[in-house]
């Protein structure tokens, strides 16, 4: 995934009202940019961090600039725009870059399914293969050398796990795909210390046949690509 045009950098002043952030450019101009991430963004939004932002040519947008990446003083890259995760994974599957999905040829997005009025992020289909339902989650929380999901209590995420479990119990393929969007993370676990219910539901889902797959993204101001497969820890 390439950023067109390449992202521009600025220094973070503050994030506020969840959806907004103030930054200062190298030229000294203060900008208010949009933040698509509604999560806690723990460790991803420290004042003084380098922010990389994109610019929309849509004249109707109140805030034309969007926060895409954070570069920390430690040298870590973090994608804070959670909307990028689905595109990143779909692109990798289409390019046959994820061996676990190499047998599937058709990719559909945001397909209605389940018993709780849900939409699956990615539905993969192929002749002589069961359908593969993929729910994509972004992992950006780094604590004690481990990446955790979620970074806040998520009833929506809990619903997705119930839906995936039901799909697996029907004999179809159900996958929880963790797109690791923090370069400092080298393993992933459920954040039981943040959302115990989510952690418990994930364990139940795995016991019912839901697969958990983790891949890390390589990121720069020019683009992103999925790289190494990471280990998911059962804690």
From Swiss-Prot:
GO terms for MF: DNA binding
PANTHER family linked to this entry: SUGAR FERMENTATION STIMULATION PROTEIN A
Organism placement in taxonomy: Bacteria, Pseudomonadati, Pseudomonadota, Gammaproteobacteria, Enterobacterales
Coiled coil feature spans: none
Family, as annotated: Belongs to the SfsA family.
Gene source species: Photorhabdus laumondii subsp. laumondii (strain DSM 15139 / CIP 105565 / TT01) (Photorhabdus luminescens subsp. laumondii)
Domain of life: Bacteria
Protein name, entry field: Sugar fermentation stimulation protein homolog
Pfam families assigned: SfsA (PF03749), SfsA_N (PF17746)
